[in-house]
Amino acid sequence: MQGRVQPFDPGALAPAQRELFEAIAGGPRAQGPQHFALTRPDGSLRGPFNAFLLAPELGGALQSLGAAIRYRGALTARAREIAILLVAAHWDSEFEREAHQAVGAASGLTPDELAALHDGDPTAFAGDEGVVATATVQLLAGDLDDELWRVASEAIGAEVVFELTTLVGYYSTLALQLRVFRVAP
């Protein structure tokens, strides 16, 4: 698939683009174990991050939101990756799926759990993870019914339901951007 936006040359970025590039390539995503490459061999950004450079102010806000979800949220790593992979399955987002299957495996998701998530199946999970999975599927349909709201707010708390809702919206936005800009994995 030919991308609609060519990779931005890291050596030819405007100041606002350079600042955003550094926040992505040198921020928390670049620290610790790397489960997927943030950059191509030529140093340009991969995935949704290249398109962020089209509008650095908005891209910067998205980058900050994504970093907050990934590194400062209350969801466990497993629960977060369950939700992200269900979003990837819903939107059939190859890049999100590829990137987050590796992160999910590193967070302890088993091959059987990853296969269920690939198929968009939330039933492989129990307890709080089951609540997160079921709530994610409902959120992807556009709402959370009263019964699941009650269960989720009691099990994981209203603040974590807020976080989950934000995560689903953020990764759905990325999936749409990846599709519109024809970003290959």
Indicate residue ranges for each PLM-predicted region.
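Mobile cap/lid helix-loop segments that border enzyme active or cofactor-binding sites
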Residues: 1-75
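Extended, structured, electrostatic nucleic-acid-contact surfaces
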Residues: 65, 144-151
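Short alpha-helical scaffolding segments that buttress acidic/His motifs in well-ordered protein cores
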Residues: 48-52, 62-69, 82-88, 117-118, ...
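Transmembrane-helix boundary/entry motifs in multi-pass membrane transporters
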Residues: 157-158
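Alpha-helical transmembrane segments and membrane-interface helix-loop junctions
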Residues: 143-144, 185
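C-terminal end-helix/capping segment
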Residues: 103-113, 117, 178-185
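A contiguous pocket-lining binding segment that forms or flanks enzyme active sites
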Residues: 107-135
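Conserved alpha-helical segments that form or flank metal/cofactor-binding pockets of metalloenzymes
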Residues: 58-60, 87-107, 111
